Amino acid sequence: MAAAVVVRRAAGLIPLLSSRFGARMPLHRALSQIPPPRFCRLLSQQTKPFSASASNGAATDRTRELRLYNTKSRKKEQFRPRIPGREVGMYVCGVTPYDDSHIGHARAYVAFDVLYRYLRYLDYEVRYVRNFTDIDDKIIARANQLGEDPFSLSKRFSDDFLSDMANLQCLPPSVEPRVSDHVDEIINMIKQILDNRCAYVVGGDVYFSVDNFPEYGELSGRKLDDNRAGERVAVDERKRNPADFALWKAAKDGEPWWDSPWGPGRPGWHIECSAMSAHYLGHSFDIHGGGEDLIFPHHENEIAQSRAACCDSTINYWIHNGFVNVNSQKMSKSLGNFVTIRKVIEMYHPLALRMFLLGTHYRSPINYTIEQLNVASDRLYYTYQTLRDCEEICQHQQSNTGNPLPANTLNYIQKLHDEFETSMSDDLHTSVALAAMSEPLKVMNDLLHTRKGKKQDKRLESLSALEEKIRVVLSVLGLLPSSYHEALQQLRDKALRRASITEELVVQKIEERTAARKAKQYEKSDEIRKELAAVGIALMDGPDGTTWRPSLPLPEEEAVLAKT
């Protein structure tokens, strides 16, 4: 049964023809670029278990009624687009590019990438805006320290950030605006706030007056008396209230500046996001996201200035991800305890890092450890190896696609489908969605490698159908590689690097062990196996000889087994 699958790419719409049981590689390369709502509908038509459908921007199947935790209401709410049938507007606060991005950034943008993918999986059209704060005190300070132009520095680190996001398979947002390109919009919004008497000018600076905005504190739950000044600098004594924050900063020597009605200067920290979100999504839109450290003061201040500029400004869902912790302390550049994305992916496949991040619910804190990265990497290898073995056997053997699948296969597919959508629709419980793949993967391994499994009726058809459904799940989670074979080789290369060993040396050790076994020197054979296992290289004996694969280093594997 052939089907035309149309996949959206930056260059346009590229039609790809795929067969259900053959020539899959072009299809899953395409699916790695975008969550496949059309593919899911195709699958729904082919097999009854895929019967969930959505129309007019609203899901009809109960498992597909997305519920998201809204920071403002402090509860989960059913997601309803502001305007049914129109695209969903989503704004996520981006990075301040003055240094390499760390895995705290990865946590945030992987989380919102999953939300973006899942909304599209549910057939919503999404306009996703994520900004670059390329004008900021930290950028200026770092540029002065390095003797570099601030815009050159921010461009360099912005490009590095985009490379990091591509490595983590985060889909590009619809728009990625920079503050420096939107100063006119920022100035116009400040004028509106001044006209509405919610701001005041002091010596070329413009401050927002929190006393003139009674709703201040609704998002964070803070009382105004408890709030510290909402800036990244010391309190200015010229403020009417210590919590007043800068909308416009007067120019200082050696800093970039723009002309304005209040004199030369540059935007404050918070106004940029209000102006850019309004420019691209309107004053009212559906979702605003960021790390939980942005709830106050940044997002609290955004709400205040947006409403002061336009009283009808409304954002329906405020969504925030939890921190990445190191030794129970938030990972951040300011604390000096951060690990960069680039440093991690020197030793681990980028999708192992993504798997690690998805293993914890996005709102919960996640503790960064090498041991957990190793577990994620091992889990990823097992998943891709199973799917690669399945792909290989289905490509080289013919299957009869005309007959229905066995009932037990349909049950496994239906169960995965239901568990995946139920967990994802419940505030994006990615850890549960990942766990839902465990049983189908085990079934696939039985069909591939056990004598009983190989004799099962419609074995190839079952393998192919299971692989197709797991591929859809991986795509929505952003874990589908362009090639299983390439990903497996990359995982092997990273394992060798972590073990500080070459593949040639591993092969040599395998040959030494084979010779020892032939000579009945079993103690030496065991020593070689344990020596490699200690550094994360597992030896696999089979009828065709001994091969190796990455694994948890032996002490860590023993610890994991002890826990289970």
From Swiss-Prot:
Major site of localization recorded for this protein: plastid
Cofactor: Zn(2+)
Top-level EC class: ligase
Binding site for ATP: 333
Superkingdom of source: Eukaryota
HAMAP family: Cys_tRNA_synth (MF_00041)
Designated name of the protein: Cysteine--tRNA ligase CPS1, chloroplastic/mitochondrial
Name of the gene this protein is made from: CPS1
